[in-house]
């Protein structure tokens, strides 16, 4: 069955859990009126990864103009807003504080309800955006694979707001593993899109192992990363030297092998869990869900309807926070002014 929510609402959603300053206006949990993202990718690329202090300071610089852009693009003003939603965790403490304190201040001054949202639940509700309704189309239960730079969680969604954590990574998150693999291959940061691009045209001359962790729904990517590292060391281009980088063919084939291994493990374990729990659909969320190989493999083997957000909605955005908040309000969700941040918040 679908989600019955009779109240018309426009929600202003904030997402600042990591390195994206994102603000969106969302109507009725499904229709995006504006979705503005101020990315810090280029800023952090020079350091080879996200620097928390730099991220939080950049949020302070970007948050006000991002809010202004969201209202301008939507053609709305404050009188049109019915509630304010914000990511309260998990994430980087300094980054979360910027979003939460701005959202609190605006909600208090405008006499609007404040709704704190779990970032991971936001990634799930990205699947309700763009006019879709997986609940109405397929029904519950569903399997959700949330895969990003900070998380790789396999979750059974029994209904709205009711989740069971089936498995998670035991070491690196998938996105973190992509970043480390890209560093080994000399590709830079962020690793996911760079590995995907470098893999184009590969013919499959390289093979890396798969870590299945049989008997569990957990994931492990450190072994795949180590296998790639050992290949790089054996061929003499890691640790990197000024005049001893890998040739383009080696980079292409190794990048493809790494991407294939990580994607296959996530896809197969997700499908196995879907069959075990007799779910009615599979949903993806998180930045790694934008990976074309993962989308392709899951699309080929999923035994049930598969929902994957558009790539722009897989990465961190305010629209998914607004969507999650809308459906929470159906259960009376509303936070007090002393709402805190929760850097280690879990979904279940």
How does the language model describe each region?
Residues 9-80, 86-90, 119, 123:
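N-terminal beta-alpha supersecondary unit
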Residues 21-26, 144, 152-156:
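Short beta-strand scaffold segments in enzyme catalytic cores
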Residues 158-201, 225-226, 230-233:
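Glycine-rich phosphate-binding loop plus the immediately following alpha-helix
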Residues 117-142, 324:
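Conserved phosphate-binding catalytic cores of ATP/NTP-utilizing and phosphoryl-transfer enzymes
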Residues 123-125, 310-347:
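Glycine-rich phosphate-binding/hydrolytic loop that grips phosphoryl groups
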Residues 86-89, 106, 148, 283-291:
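Glycine-rich beta-strand-to-loop/alpha-helix junction loops that act as flexible
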Residues 116-117, 298-321:
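Conserved phosphate-binding/catalytic loops in two-lobed NTP-binding clefts
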